[in-house]
UniProtKB/Swiss-Prot annotation:
Domain of life of the organism encoding this protein: Eukaryota
Quaternary structure and partners: Part of the photosystem II complex.
Name used for this protein in its record: Photosystem II reaction center Psb28 protein
Pfam families: Psb28
Family named by the database record: Belongs to the Psb28 family.
Gene3D superfamilies registered for this protein in UniProt: Photosystem II Psb28 (2.40.30.220)
Organism of this sequence: Cyanidium caldarium
Bilayer disposition of the protein: Peripheral membrane protein
Principal location class: plastid
Length: 115
């Protein structure tokens, strides 16, 4: 099962919008994951301490991909969204990310399409 976490051990329930860019030679690129009202904010508003957001972790049966490039957006002083940027450095990294995205979409009964 493919899952996304911001705090290790706690699955994010909000499904992100994922925007992909790719270099002309197809070897490098960027994946931007945007989460509106992610459930991780609900954890931080509770009285229990679940820990800090330390990155975004993409986990599936092949292992884990991660990025520390995670930012929170606030509206009127309240957390509203999280955006994470995952850099793809080579063709095998691109292929691996696409396998994760396809597994994640399948697990969530969604489909992937090119725009």
């Amino acid at each position: 099962m493919a899952k996304i976490q911001f705090i290790k051990g706690i699955d994010e329930q909000t499904v992100p919008e994922i925007r992909l860019t790719r270099s002309r030679d197809g070897n490098t690129g960027t994946a931007i994951f945007s989460f509106i009202n992610p459930t991780v904010f609900l954890l931080h508003s509770s009285s229990q301490n679940y820990g800090e957001i330390t990155g975004m972790y993409l986990q599936d049966d092949e292992g884990e991909l991660s990025t520390r490039n995670v930012t929170a957006n606030f509206v009127n002083g309240k957390p509203k969204a999280v955006e994470a940027v995952y850099l793809i450095r080579n063709k095998s990294g691109w292929d691996r990310l696409m396998r994760f995205i396809n597994k994640y979409a399948e697990d969530k009964n969604m489909s992937f399409y090119k725009s």
